[in-house]
Amino acid sequence: MATHPKHIHFIGICGTAMGSTAVALRALGHNVSGSDSQVYPPMSDVLRDAGITVTEGYKPENLPPDADVYVVGNAISRGNAELEALLEKKLPYVSMAEMLKREVIQGKRSFVVSGTHGKTTTTTMLAWIFEHAGKNPGFMIGGVPENFESGARFTHSDLFVIEGDEYDTAYFDKRSKFFHYLPECAIVNNVEFDHADIFDDLDAILLSFRRFLNLVPRNGLVLINGDDPNCLSLREKCPAPLKTVGLGPACDLRIQITAATPESTMFSINGDPFEVPMVGEFNARNAAMCVAAARFAGLSDDEIRAGLVSFRGIRRRQQERGTTNGVTVIDDFGHHPTAIRETLRGLRQRYEGRRLWALFEPRSNTSRRNVLQDELID
């Protein structure tokens, strides 16, 4: 990780990932500035409290002449006034993913959590297991974790946990973001068709995941969902050691659900007992992935158990907002049919015997298209 202070300017700083990265780099001692088309709370408050100067609106004069590098957000495209000025002046620029690679991940043990669903929960859970064990990990999470003050933290620990998104990187780099994250341990929770705005079909997504796994060194580890046929198809020609994790009898690390309550799930992995304060097989599998990754990092099962049982989850992941007149309101971020299905299955376990009403807002690019309409109806 780079140690000498730099001036880093973010174009599109108010996005969740860009803002979190900016704050974490500021905490390392870098001089950070940025701009965005709209600057408003809560991100504007977070950036201000971190001592970051933010300019509203995109103008060529916003570009600080003394900046060492300019970070171009994924939402920025040609025609943006600052981007056009940056290109004309031939100033050095990178994507956010490349900035993370250069300034944060290089030289560390990088644990990259990927997959269509469960990335944020699994990333946060693994980071918390490391934190609870006193490892002081760095992390980059695409959500708001309850166990940490923010979604990003960069430390001098050799452990770094990051959510590996298969979405593209920037207007000038159409590779998936996870190609930049130097995985020593790669987790693939599941693979389904998503991001219809950039992938033509499932085969295109699988190709991106195969190329991602090709980055894992021979002394690393690949963990895949052994219950997912698409994940199992990734085994062929994978150059790194690979283990399957799942409930099926053929899995290398076999999960068995031993008990469940409305608040937690007890399970075993090849006979070793664990507990996670979340409901559903889906979350038991997420937790089992974390167990395997933490073991690879050198943690004992007792350290892992202590981290798991104290995990508090993510905001907007089956988050209870309150109860009025006997009606409990739950907020969840899931938008893919499988994520919705698993969320409802978990809620039926958590609120057994109660009637469920589901209100769905199609906000993602894929959910607003007709490619998944039949699955959404089901």
Which ranges hold each PLM region?
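Conserved motor-coupling elements within RecA-like helicase/translocase cores
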Residues: 154-156
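Walker A (P-loop) phosphate-binding motif
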Residues: 9-10, 24, 96-145, 255
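Switch II of P-loop NTPase G domains
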Residues: 168-182, 338-346
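Short beta-strand "acidic-cap" motif of Rossmann-like dinucleotide-binding folds
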Residues: 31-36, 138-139, 244
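Active-site beta-alpha connecting loops in nucleotide-dependent enzymes
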Residues: 4-22, 31-38, 314, 338-378
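Short acidic-hydrophobic, aromatic-tinged amphipathic segments that line or gate anion-handling sites
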Residues: 54-58, 94
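Switch II (G3) loop of P-loop NTPases
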Residues: 159-169, 329-335
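Acidic, Mg2+-coordinating active-site environments of NTP-dependent enzymes
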Residues: 41-49, 62-72, 77-95, 101, ...
